[in-house]
Amino acid sequence: MKKYPYTTIDEDKIGGFNYGNRGDQFYTQEKNIVSELSNYDLKGKIIYCNCDRPTVSNFYKFFKNNFNDLGLKGLYASYYDDNPLLAYFNGSQETYKRLSSGRFQDNGEVMKLCDIVITNPPFSDSMATELIRMAKKYGKHVIIVGPNTIASQKEMFDMIKNNQLNMGYTTINRFNTPSGEKKTAPTSWWTTIETNKPFFKTGVKYNPSNYQKLDNFDAIDIVRFDKDLPDDYYGYMAVSPRFLRVLNRNQFDIITKIRPVIN
């Protein structure tokens, strides 16, 4: 897929108007948006950025500035505010409509109009999972930034296991805050779109003396999957949730989630 160049927007400017606790407000840098979204075919899609103030959101600006190159059909954006507006861009004209509420939970009718929700919701498990759940209810896809701990929640894990939710292609852990500071956070891209990642290889051969067995499951413990996962082992392996970032569904199956015990 074509790699889209940065627009003239400063990558250090804030990228989304989120709501929730002020400590949850981490704004996405444009370079991270470009890096991840270049992996998806968005041609003919209507995008909804539902936690994004159009005047400052790097998500909205990226889609608006690359509307024709991406082949988009439409672009919506809404945000939390006492007097919110819904922005719509069709490639040539931008219009605004007053909303009764900026909370994405109250704007299901707008979500029904889109194909994919792409945003950075407030950094809390409940917000991210609620957004995924809502999009699933309306039959819409998501590409969002969310906490790594999403994978530990039963409902979300079941979606991961059934290939209904995947970790994205690129890493993302540096953000800007309302005060202008740069912060790091344990986050990932999450999407309900099926990913197509290359087979994962470390070049490591299995040696039983190098791996401990779990006491509570018939699996070997993989401490650092990027360095220790053996290419020639075909039994069960216990890996951290971060392994989802390199998961190829044709290479590995997700079986279950456990809290490993090794005595």
Task: Describe each region flagged by the PLM.
Residues 1-263:
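Class I S-adenosyl-L-methionine-dependent methyltransferase catalytic core
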